[in-house]
């Protein structure tokens, strides 16, 4: 019974999975908007690191939780079929960026290519996949949101220090704190909400 209550609480506290995906999109796009050609190399590198970590976590969450659920209910799988290949191309560009020095003339070009790919991917999801999910999934949206929150905690924890370091060392402004910290804040607040209700793993 306690497990059932905990699951109900989790679903109630968590945003729907579609809203979580939109929040992820907003956070990474905010990071993109901070990138300028005349930024210092250190600032560029930190921005790119922040965006890349957020994208990797986001892509893994979608592939493990959202896409499998959508494959069951979607009537038009064309966007789904290209989503994972688009993620893989994104990962290829991320690997290139990580291997480059920010002074490399190709660094800006590669990040701009990543930005274009992500913007196209976001447009497909927000105009096709997410509205379809909201039409056909009903209460499953909150359940999947709770699943994504739990998995996000697991994926984010090992990289929290790196995200915080990139943010606090280079971007003391509120906009960058929001951009880099959106993933961390969502998972932290969800965890605190569970603790505040007194439901621990030991119960």
Regions found by a protein language model. Name each.
Residues 1-203:
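Small-residue-biased structural context
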């Amino acid at each position: 019974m306690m497990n059932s209550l905990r699951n109900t609480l989790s679903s109630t506290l968590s945003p729907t999975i579609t809203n979580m995906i939109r929040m992820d999109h907003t956070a990474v796009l905010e990071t993109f908007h901070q990138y300028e050609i005349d930024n210092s190399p250190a600032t560029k590198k930190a921005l790119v690191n922040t965006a890349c970590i957020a994208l990797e976590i986001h892509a893994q969450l979608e592939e493990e939780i959202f896409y499998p659920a959508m494959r069951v209910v979607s009537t038009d799988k064309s966007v789904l079929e290209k989503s994972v290949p688009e993620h893989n191309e994104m990962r290829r560009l991320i690997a290139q960026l990580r291997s480059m020095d920010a002074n490399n003339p190709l660094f800006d070009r590669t990040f701009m290519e990543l930005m274009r790919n992500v913007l196209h991917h976001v447009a497909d999801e927000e105009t096709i996949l997410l509205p379809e999910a909201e039409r056909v999934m009903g209460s499953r949206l909150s359940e999947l949101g709770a699943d994504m929150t739990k998995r996000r905690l697991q994926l984010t924890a090992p990289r929290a220090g790196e995200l915080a370091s990139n943010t606090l060392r280079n971007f003391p402004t509120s906009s960058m704190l929001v951009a880099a910290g959106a993933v961390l804040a969502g998972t932290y607040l969800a965890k605190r909400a569970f603790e505040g209700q007194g439901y621990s793993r030991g119960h």
